[in-house]
Amino acid sequence: MANVYDLANELERAVRALPEYQAVLTAKAAIENDADAQVLWQDFLAAQSKVQEMMQSGQMPSQEEQDEMSKLGEKIESNDLLKVYFDHQQRLSVYMSDIEKIVFAPMQDLM
């Protein structure tokens, strides 16, 4: 029987080798090399963190915060580097979702 940890490490290497993963890495590097994209990226991460904290504490963003997030979303959509990043990230997430279903299938059997 194969060692489960060896299989998990092999899966990690396989994910890193996916063209979709490599595309996300390339897109991320492009963002890091562009000052405007990097500022928008940092703004996005801060907004995402703020929303997650609010939701975890049972709060909803105010209308003003929602408007700010919409404006940030529009800025992100208009930035080609960030748009490419999120497009590649979406493609990679399809793989990750499929892998998650496969890996957690045995846990579903126990429910």
UniProtKB/Swiss-Prot annotation:
SUPFAM superfamilies: YheA/YmcA-like (SSF158622). It holds the Pfam family Com_YlbF. InterPro entries: Com_YlbF (IPR010368), YheA/YmcA-like_dom_sf (IPR023378). It comes from the Bacteria. Disulfide bonds: none annotated. HAMAP family: UPF0342. Belongs to the UPF0342 family. This is UPF0342 protein gbs1446.
